[in-house]
Structures are given as C-alpha cells and as structure tokens.
C-alpha cells in the first residue's frame, strides 16, 4: 500500500519499469522467467473535495464525467510523440490558479507536480502595481502583455479609453511587461526547483512544451528557456 493524505484521492498510476529478480529497466516482463517481480510506480493524486466539486459542476450542465485526467497528461497525449517521451519532455500547463507540470523520460512519467500560482496571480500583480481593477488588469495582460522585457514594443505606453474612472489613464508598457516577466520567472523557477532536487532536470531532452491560457503570451517561451 502507498500512503497519501487522507484528504486526497488517486488519479493515475504509471508503471515506469519492472524489476525481474533484481534486473533493472525491464519495460515488459511478459514471457520472462523469474521468481520475483517488482515495479517502479509514479502516482498522481489530488485533493478529493476539489475533484468532487469539478465533477459536480460538470454534472450541473448537465453532462456526465467519464474520467478525470491530470491536465498536463491530457496535453501530453496530443503534443508529444513517442520519441519525444522517450528522449525526455517537460509539459508545463499554466492555468489561472495553478501551474501543473509533468516530466516524461524513457517513455513514461518520472515526475509531476501542481503549484498554487498561475495567470490569476499575474492579474493580481498588475492590479496592485498599476492600481487598476482586476478585470482591467486581465485585459491589459491579454491585449498588451509580453513576457520578454528585452524585446522592444512598437509603443512605449497606451492610453485607456472607455473605462469608468480610468478613461485617459496612461499605462507604461515597459512596466506592464516587467510585472509579467517577474511573476513568470518565479513560476518557472518553482517548476525548476523540484526537478533539480530530484536530479531530473537533465532528463529534459526533447524540450519544454507550454500549454494553458498563458502559453499564448508573446515571449513566454524565451522566459522558460532563460530559467
């Protein structure tokens, strides 16, 4: 048995490889001779109440839930080829409230995680620094945001229009880009830290693959490469 917090529920069980009588790295033991069979597993679990709430929301549509899949695993099935999974690939899904990641190596999952930081935190940063409401901060990020501060913009600033109390307000785009850049640096470093601790960072052979709403932000790939 594997111990996980009582508040959590199992989502996925991935067999990385088998051991036959102590022989390591066996991918398929069928047909082999031996007296002892062991396996190296990677388990993914989540907070039970959050999973239950997600199911309840879908059923209220009304629709039925066939299964629950960890977001970057679902993305990996579309984005990654078998060769890329074998060579090593890191999928990072930056959502609103969380950043989820999964690392493939030798065709199977070797590490995964969920961080409590995402695009909504960037909106909050913009709102606090520029002193604008959250809905306007989101619009600024989507319409004028850029992750790479070194790449020059065609404009140095913009003037807000059609915004109650903020009509005519000038926004410094360099400052906006700096806010986004700093939070993204934090997010990618938070992903990097556990990979370094487990000694898995050098297993990213075929590259880093970004998904989620934040992946559309211009220059985000360069920030990921910088980290």
Predicted regions, residues:
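Nucleotide/phosphate-binding catalytic cleft detector across ATP-hydrolyzing
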Residues: 1-90, 108, 133-135, 139, ...
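Residue-level signature of catalytic and energy-coupling elements of molecular machines
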Residues: 58, 93, 126, 191, ...
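Gly/Thr-rich phosphate-binding beta-strand-loop-beta motif of the actin/hexokinase/Hsp70
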Residues: 80-111, 126
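Short beta-alpha connecting loops at secondary-structure transitions
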Residues: 110-111, 124, 172-176, 206
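A conserved active-site cap/scaffold subdomain adjacent to cofactor or substrate pockets
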Residues: 116-138
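Feature representing long, continuous alpha-helical segments
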Residues: 124, 174, 178, 182-189, ...
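Glycine-rich phosphate-binding loops at beta-strand->alpha-helix junctions
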Residues: 146-148, 203-226
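Phosphate/pyrophosphate-binding loops at sites that engage ATP/ADP/AMP, CoA/4′-phosphopantetheine
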Residues: 188, 192-206
């Amino acid at each position: 048995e594997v111990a996980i917090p009582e508040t959590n529920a199992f989502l996925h069980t991935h067999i990385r490889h088998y051991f036959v009588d102590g022989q390591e790295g066996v991918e398929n033991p069928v047909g082999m001779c031996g007296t002892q069979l062991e396996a190296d597993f990677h388990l993914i679990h989540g907070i039970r109440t959050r999973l239950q709430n997600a199911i309840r929301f879908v059923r209220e549509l009304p629709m039925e839930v066939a299964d629950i899949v960890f977001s970057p695993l679902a993305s990996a099935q579309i984005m990654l080829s078998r060769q890329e999974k074998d060579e090593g690939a890191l999928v990072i899904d930056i959502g609103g409230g969380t950043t989820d990641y999964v690392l493939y190596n030798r065709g199977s999952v070797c590490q995964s995680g969920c961080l409590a930081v995402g695009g909504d935190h960037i909106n909050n940063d913009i709102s606090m620094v520029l002193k604008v409401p959250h809905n306007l901060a989101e619009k600024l990020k989507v319409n004028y945001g850029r992750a790479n501060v070194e790449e020059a913009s065609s404009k140095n600033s913009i003037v807000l229009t059609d915004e109650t109390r903020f009509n005519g307000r000038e926004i410094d785009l360099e400052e906006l880009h700096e806010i986004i850049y700093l939070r993204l640096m934090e997010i990618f470093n938070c992903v990097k830290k556990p990979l370094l601790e487990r000694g898995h960072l050098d297993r990213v052979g075929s590259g880093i693959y970004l998904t989620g709403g934040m992946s559309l932000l211009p220059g985000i790939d360069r920030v990921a490469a910088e980290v």
